Amino acid sequence: MQKIVVYVYIYLFVQISVDPVALDGSSQPTENTEKDGLCNACTWRQNTKSSRIEAIKIQILSKLRLEQAPNISRDVIKQLLPKAPPLQELIDQYDVQRDDSSDGSLEDDDYHATTETIITMPTESDFLVQMEGKPKCCFFKFSSKIQYNKVVKAQLWIYLRQVQKPTTVFVQILRLIKPMKDGTRYTGIRSLKLDMNPGNGIWQSIDVKTVLQNWLKQPESNLGIEIKAFDENGRDLAVTFPGPGEDGLNPFLEVRVTDTPKRSRRDFGLDCDEHSTESRCCRYPLTVDFEAFGWDWIIAPKRYKANYCSGECEFVFLQKYPHTHLVHQANPRGSAGPCCTPTKMSPINMLYFNGKEQIIYGKIPAMVVDRCGCS
């Protein structure tokens, strides 16, 4: 229904722009016709921009399968954001936009967003609460988006507090299991020994891909893990439950999953700017600012170039749109006329909090207008 309404508006605008009509039904061109036409075009483009921004907000929530924007304050975000290398890399080296309409970029056919990286923070499980001698950490709940056969990489990141002198640190990651007859409650995942020098604390990553895949295949076996990291004097260096001044130093899981995009068909279109006098269907620049929406739950990008389509699609533009002209010639009565719409769209990468306070790095399809055309 919305598409039909847009088509009607475009059709009416084209008719008014081409042939201004007086109230008595007679055509009355004036010396200001050209100027008025340009003003009308500016007004039309402004309305199109506003509609495009509102549509983008709706599309993002829909494609992320969110009924509403997550209600996460800036203070909470500051506490939840890990001060860790993988997250900082995503933010610092963020590929916000590939605004190159000349190349055959990759894009997905699916409507919903595809997930590439999920950063999961630890929670407390019932099993850990019920245990005697409760372990320090950690239990991770996994998103349904993670399938065991799609996991490319799974890293457990832990932060080790600073040391006062050169020392050797012994790190041990244990997987919790249901108590056996001999009382055993743990099985080893990984042990490592590393040397630390005085200075700031460090982040250490441990490969847990195999364990994660087993958990995904058998969810009931996921009872949590315990993290141990001691120096030569028995001092516990692992930050499992952050203390004062340790916000953002929680352990977390970084999981990367496969994403297999398909190549899109290449076509061509016009590019214009806001000062252009081009009347034909054209792509115009539009920057979407998430901070202006109050969408603090989007970590990156804070803004991106979305672009939009606007302009006329008359049948006289034969050289620019030959296919549309041939269709009209074959069936002149069966077509209401072409409309200016996106003919190629590409995805954006986004780093965001979902409703469960998990950090997701994913790809949202069809969010950038690369080319416009008449169809």
UniProtKB/Swiss-Prot annotation:
Major localization class: secreted
UniProt-listed InterPro entries: Cystine-knot_cytokine, TGF-b_C, TGF-b_propeptide, TGF-beta-rel, TGFb_CS
Annotated signal peptide: 1-23
Subcellular location: Secreted
Gene for this chain: MSTN
Family: Belongs to the TGF-beta family.
Entry keyword rRNA processing: no
Molecular function GO labels: cytokine activity; growth factor activity
Lineage start: Eukaryota, Metazoa, Chordata, Craniata, Vertebrata
CDD domains: TGF_beta_GDF8 (cd19388)
Alphabetic keyword roster: Cleavage on pair of basic residues, Cytokine, Disulfide bond, Glycoprotein, Growth factor, Secreted, Signal
Glycosylation sites per record: N71
Cysteines joined through disulfide linkages: C272-C282, C281-C340, C309-C372, C313-C374
UniProt keyword annotation of Signal present: yes
Protein name in UniProt: Growth/differentiation factor 8
SUPFAM superfamilies cross-referenced by the UniProt entry: Cystine-knot cytokines
Prosegment residue ranges: 24-266
UniProt function note: Acts specifically as a negative regulator of skeletal muscle growth.
Listed GO CC annotations: extracellular space
Species this protein is from: Coturnix coturnix (Common quail)
Subunit structure: Homodimer; disulfide-linked.
GO BP terms in the entry: muscle cell proliferation; negative regulation of myoblast proliferation; negative regulation of satellite cell differentiation; negative regulation of skeletal muscle satellite cell proliferation
